[in-house]
Amino acid sequence: DLSVDVKPGMRVAIVGPTGCGKTTLINLLMRFYDVQDGQITIDGTPVQQIGRKALRKNFGMVLQDTWLKCGSILENIRMGNPGASYDEVVAAAKKAHAHSFIQRLPEGYYTKIGEDGGSLSQGQKQLLCIARIMLCDPSVLILDEATSSIDTTTEMRIQQAFLTLMEGRTSFIVAHRLSTIKGADLILVMKNGTIIEQGTHASLLSDKGFYYHLYNSQFPETDQLA
């Protein structure tokens, strides 16, 4: 039972325990499968009336499970925009904080990798996918556990890069680390497939409901209203 109104340009965070329905909500938005009851609309048009290909062209996704293809680093990033120049690819990689590790690879941007990413770490593979999204410049972002396998220092840098990327774009962030979504315009708190709370970080803490206890479990020694 969901009822949410997301305005253009809003940053929306989706949080809750494992299995609460966060990923299902994203799958419905992307039309990986369709809603059985009710409807999801974009600018007043039900998503079922928008072709899947046309719908997904507007979305940029960074998932916990990365997807790469056999080919060079350059080709993998350029999937976000096949017509992009070398300089544009490098610029996107710099924004994603991937440029420095790419430069250290044997052949830099021309280093070949397999679908499993070869010797790249999970964090490095995610950085490549983030660079790809930087390059395709979508109108809507979906970040599903995007920084879950990246070290804390890199995560901070990526968060800053995404703050720039999210400006003027509607963004949906699915995360377990509540510290990364405190600045969201709207936080949807899910449990058992239902949105049980919604509001800003400050308002949800002041309500002292489920979100308050979820946040407190991660930061027990933090001033909750800070």
Show where each model-derived region lies:
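ABC-type nucleotide-binding domain
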Residues: 1-226
